Amino acid sequence: MNPETKARIDQLVTANKVMVFMKGTKLMPQCGFSNNVVQILNMLGIPFETLDVLADAEIRQGIKEYSNWPTIPQVYVNGEFVGGSDIMIELYQNGELQEMLEVALAS
């Protein structure tokens, strides 16, 4: 990944308490996994920002290197990589996600 792409990702991850790199947008997710993440965050009423990786090939590849995680979507909370769709579902079901997000939004 080039330094410019890394700097863009750094800026997005640090500027937004909850940042989702996904396929599509909040209003029109382009894959089921991205849709799962959007639905969970919407259900919890959590404000979040997204970046459509389908519209940006450098970010689409760069985010995988950045997190050392091979799949999209990718969720960051307070600058920390949380995971993708499966991890978000698991954290939501066991109540950890709500707690993590409440702490993040309070900081």
UniProtKB/Swiss-Prot annotation:
Annotated residues for binding of glutathione: 23, 60, 85-86
UniProt entry tagged with the keyword Repressor: no
Pfam family of the protein (one): Glutaredoxin
Ranges where the Glutaredoxin domain occurs: 6-107
An annotated Gene Ontology molecular function: 2 iron, 2 sulfur cluster binding
Domain of life the protein comes from: Bacteria
The protein, known as: Uncharacterized monothiol glutaredoxin ycf64-like
